[in-house]
Amino acid sequence: EGQTRVDHRNAGIVRLDGVECGAGAILGAPGAGAALLDEVVDRATVVLCGEMLGGMSQAFDLTLEYLKTRDQFGVKIGSFQGLQHRAANVFMEIELARSCVMAAARAVDAGAKDRSKLVSLAKARCSDAYVLAANEGVQIFGGVGMTDEYDIGFYMKRARASELTFGDAAFHRNRWATIGKY
């Protein structure tokens, strides 16, 4: 059953009612399903983190362009120190997220022992940074940021949906701590 999510992604619902599988239908070794599922979800999560990184970067670029072009009180709004500080904070969070995504992607590619921990770190950082970049963008754009005329509102929706996909930031911080035995 097909659906369109709030962030314009396509989604589907698969219903398996009354399905029975015989012993010959088992994929992989019996009892090894959880480890395989963890690996698949880690791979999917790091791919999502890459998409989130691209989205937050684009939201930030749109916001920077708006700061450079929007006039208020006879000057560009990007000249206001308070907005410069907000932009610098978003930039820092995006770069931290970028480093985490790159480390997680390398760990997934290498089949590293700390793969799951690095993936959870990346997802937690990306969730927080993407929501921050989108929220700050909407705040800086003002009311027009919520209209369909400006893409920043789309990135806010995408940030919220991506944040919840494969576990939110709190889930991944808890997973990171559990894996690290904290």
Regions found by a protein language model. Name each.
Residues L64, K68-G78, F91-R125, V138-F141, ...:
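C-terminal helix-coil-helix/basic helical segment that borders enzyme active sites and/or dimer interfaces
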Residues E1-D61, E65, V75, A170:
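FAD-binding core of flavoproteins
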Residues R43, G50, Q81-F91, S120-K123, ...:
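Extended, low-aromatic, Leu/Ala- and acidic/polar-enriched alpha-helical coiled-coil segments
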Residues R106, D114, Y130-M156:
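A glycine-biased, small/acidic residue-tolerant capping/turn segment at secondary-structure junctions
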Residues L36, K123-E136:
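Short, hydrophobic/aliphatic alpha-helical segments
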Residues F141-Y182:
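Glycine-rich phosphate/cofactor-binding loops in nucleotide/flavin-utilizing enzymes
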